[in-house]
Amino acid sequence: MGHSRRPVGGEKKSRGFGRSKAVADVGDGRQTGGKPQVKKATFESTKKKEIGVSDLTLLSKISNEAINDNLKLRFQHDEIYTYIGHVLVSVNPFRDLGIYTDKVLESYRGKNRLEVPPHVFAVAESAYYNMKSYNDNQCVIISGESGAGKTEAAKRIMQYIASVSGGSDSSIQHTKDMVLATNPLLESFGNAKTLRNNNSSRFGKYLELEFNSRGEPVGANITNYLLEKSRVVGQITNERNFHIFYQFTKAAPQKYRDMFGIQQPQSYLYTSRSKCYDVPGVDDAAEFRDTLNAMGVIGMSEPEQDQVFRMLSAILWIGNIQFVEDDSGNAAIPDQSTVNYVAYLLEVDPGQVNKALTIRIMETARGGRRGSVYEVPLNTVQALAVRDALAKAIYFNLFDWIVERVNQSLTARGTVANSIGILDIYGFEIFEKNSFEQLCINYVNEKLQQIFIQLTLKAEQDEYAREQIQWTPIKYFDNKVVCSLIEDKRPPGVFAALNDACATAHADSGAADNTFVGRLNFLSQNPNFENRQGQFIVKHYAGDVSYAVEGMTDKNKDQLLKDLLNLVGSSSNEFVHTLFPNQVNQDDKRRPPTASDKIKASANDLVATLMKAQPSYIRTIKPNDNKAPKEYNEGNVLHQIKYLGLQENVRIRRAGFAYRQTFDKFVERFYLLSPKTSYAGDYTWTGDAESGARQILKDTSIPQEEFQMGITKVFVKTPETLFALEAMRDRYWHNMAIRIQRAWRNYLRYRIECAIRIQRFWRRMTGGLELIKVRDQGHKVLQGRKERRRMSLLGSRRFLGDYLGIANKGGPGEMIRNGAGIGSDTVLFSCRGEVLVSKFGRSSKPSPRIFVLTNRHFIIVAQNLVNGQLVISAERTIPIGAIKSVSTSNLKDDWFSFVIGAQEPDPLMNCVFKTELFTHLSNALHGQLNIKIADHIEYNKKPGKLATVKVVKEPGSSNVDTYKSSTIHTSAGEPPSSVSKPTPRGKQVAARPVTKGKLLRPGGPGGGPSKLAARPMPARQPVPQPAASQAPAPQPAAVPRPVPQPVAAVAASHTRTASSGSMRAPPPPPPVSPPAPKKPMAKVLYDFSSAQSNELSIKAGELVEIVSKEGNGWWLCMNTTTSVQGWTPQAYLEEQKAAPPPPPPAAPRSTPATNGTATAAAAKAKPAPPAPPAKRPNMAGRKMAPPPPSAPRDSAVSMNSQDSSGGSGRGTPNSASNASLAGGLAEALRQRQEAMHGKQDDDDEW
């Protein structure tokens, strides 16, 4: 902080400091010649909306009230730091805001003041950076009244410097630890609770951190000022003695209690006089542990600690010595035991203690020779004063010894190159009764204020002169006259008059005070002084303060009686001699230095030290006197604003220009605002920084009267101009963010489209492996005992499960889910089907329903129209655990029943996806599903009444099963042992462009055509020509949907026929009707005589028509002559192969091979007649009539469709006579697949 003393010309290389090279070169006001090294602008992602103004120089109106309003606004939003140029203003929040964490600390490392919000870490960073960069000693002056947060600010500066100063050496780290340990140690001995502050510093401290040439701390030195030793012997109500007395008496270990007789603070006069023993929120025992730990870190040995606590114990017990008047009116000590214990602690003779406290030795002198010696008894008042003087002297010297011991441990371990000083001294004090202590404190604050004004004004004037800027001087209050009023000897000031009074009337304090009042009359002509009866007023910069004269001369003498010096000199304790090293010189007649002399000398030494360093300033403000968070007393703060001179500081800083910055830094901040200095966020200016700054101001239309160009800096006149520049910069980022968002959204769309393509390709490659596994499991569920439909065995068939989307959100599936009350059950399977419904007075009839299988229930859902509204409801809910078995036939029909055995009838249902339903139900029951497969279906039509539905196979019947009169008529299916065909491979097509986006060119973000699209297509294979006996089935023309594809890709892949309204290709003709299928025939090999009425007698050599085949060794045959049907052993027959049909356009489908082996074996020898079948249908003498056409019914795929090639799987011819029909269907399917591939359907999912 402060005003940099950086050289204008030349270049000074820094050595390994924390900032990046770009920041250092740009931000230091130094140019390396030619084009400046400008760091690329970045958006401040952590930048918050500014509350008020962060720099008071940017206020539009400069007044104390405006400053107060801005500080209040920021305080209410937890913004406690505000700048005045390089000066930091801090308002005490009286609570933890979480702004001193390691993360916050790291955010300020290596950052310029303008890059981050105001903070005490920014002050520390600036001081450390300037020290390393320019080898200048730095100092941070913290000022403000008691309780404003000065000590906290000093600790945070030490925290920051210890963190960023580097150094991995163990000695460097030990030095850091010791420096940080000085805080709790000196606070316990030097701080106390006052009415205005619970941790008020009752001494001044100047900590000087010493660094080597690498910026690593190698040592430190502490100078203490103005310890308030009078607090040791007396405090006002609700205040406390120094913290250490309460820490020691409350938490002393048993060793010290035994050695020194330590008791609770209520037992001692010096700690109980004010009746205040505790501080809200402070744990004295924990603080004492921190104090002991700090002593250990400093290196204080255990014997040294014992001696320190021995002296503290002696002070406490000295305060308990009481005096009474004897018969002669002199002071006497009634309780000798306390005197004896004090003598034990000081290691002196008790008689000497008694004598030193009650008798004063007077000596007369004549003509320069020693005269007579008299022992003058003291009265009780005088004895109490002597007692308190001894206690204060011991504590004062003990505090000095602790500081010296700390300095001894912090002695520099290496060569000291530079230093950073931190001044923490209690601020300006105004009480109801102000005495000598307040005069000294306020005097030192006047000296610090004088430094602040002189250096601030001087630095401002020097900068304007150096930069050749025209400005108007600002009037301000120079407090040098107040300092002279207090410290001057000619004419005599307050201190000189006080010393003269002490020397003239030294024997009687009352007479000395009266003499002092008389001397003050000579100062009445000074405009900053007023003399009143018994008091005088000094007009300080912080306000008028009235000081009481009474007792001021005694405090100024500040000398220990020779009797007490002789007492401590007689001690056998070496530590006591260390505290009082000066021997009593009986012959020295010179006046010893007074307290005012000492404070004057200390203040001048401090000023001389600060003047040799580059200063930084922190002005602390106390928002209220109640130490309450979030309370802002405008009157109190306004008073502090006035006496701290913040308004004058703002005026001096403004001086006509609210903002100034080096050319390099200005260009780095605002180069985005000019098209000649930036392009797409990059710095493009090739000239020097000064011309770049001029160009930016020109392109942003800033009037000439609003700025001036100096030698190395640009000066902006009003804060509104700076706000306009910052607003334009923010708008640039806003526009850039919109462009980035647009590009990012386009990129995301590109990624999503690519992901969809990859997923689609993966699904095509894998073909839904999990679904295939479930499909293959379905073959095992049927146990190879039930004929299969040909469409069920397609390689593309998948067991998708939830066909109706019951588990989906939205759409019809959600309507069904809500209407059926499925709730949170997991849906395993859903499709449409039929349930056999019995109606009174009518025959049973299939009725459409919806089947839903969940992990717990099987639900039959009905859809009804009620008052013109579709109502969906669960007609029946069956727990899956209640399903005892499933009954189905061994033919290819889709009917089955659930045997439940409940009070309700078992449902008889028709579902085209029966096998898939059985599979999911078996998995839900963990494989415990019992499936009964026979030539009929059993179910309980009524509770306890078992009904049977026969299933018969009729040749030539349609692919749609029909139900009539408890009989299901179906056609022949694939053999029960059939399995699914392999998954068909898709036809390779040309690759499409990667994206259809408008911002991205085809081929992806990099542009260019897709590489896949450039691959040559495989040569198109000729279609096999049909035989002459069959009309060819023309291939339908595929009309692909248009896609955005590059011209090159289209040309490289394939050519397309242009389609238009006038040039549309004619539709393909309908397929030729297939010839009537031939009936399967069998030749009789052996004679067979029927044994039952349902068997057919045959003779060798006859031809019989095969009606149906059973897997149990019996065939149902019909005599073509008599048209009689019956059961015939399969081994007695040889099936005659039908003549092959003409070759279809597509590859003919292979038919199942006949059992030629069995036939050949039968031809060799006639086997024994097989055993009669276990159960045969009663068909003796009955002619099998073809079933009537069935009414259309609903199904999962298309329950209303009778198309034999539909998804129901019911249009598959099974006999050899239907081979031509199979060929036609195969050709139609092949053409449909080619059309689908030609359209490049991206949404085809199995």
From Swiss-Prot:
Describe the task this protein carries out: Type-I myosin implicated in the organization of the actin cytoskeleton. Required for proper actin cytoskeleton polarization. At the cell cortex, assembles in patch-like structures together with proteins from the actin-polymerizing machinery and promotes actin assembly. Functions as actin nucleation-promoting factor (NPF) for the Arp2/3 complex. Plays an important role in polarized growth, spore germination, hyphal morphogenesis, and septal wall formation.
Modification type Phosphoserine: residues = S372
Name all TH1 domain ranges.
Answer: 788-976
Which cysteine pairs make disulfide bonds? none
**Record comment regarding domains:** The myosin motor domain displays actin-stimulated ATPase activity and generates a mechanochemical force. The tail domain participates in molecular interactions that specify the role of the motor domain. It is composed of several tail homology (TH) domains, namely a putative phospholipid-binding myosin tail domain (also named TH1), an Ala- and Pro-rich domain (TH2), followed by an SH3 domain and a C-terminal acidic domain (TH3).
Q: Which Gene3D superfamilies match?
A: 1.10.10.820, 1.20.5.4820, 1.20.58.530, Kinesin motor domain, Myosin VI head, motor domain, U50 subdomain, SH3 Domains
User: Is Repeat one of the keywords UniProt gives this record?
Assistant: yes
User: Where are the annotated segments for Actin-binding?
Assistant: 419-501
What domain of life?
Answer: Eukaryota
Myosin motor domain location is 51-730
Write out the annotated subcellular location.
Answer: Cytoplasm, Cytoskeleton, Actin patch
Classification via PROSITE patterns: MYOSIN_MOTOR (PS51456), SH3 (PS50002), TH1 (PS51757)
Record domain SH3: where = 1077-1138
* UniProt protein name: Myosin-1
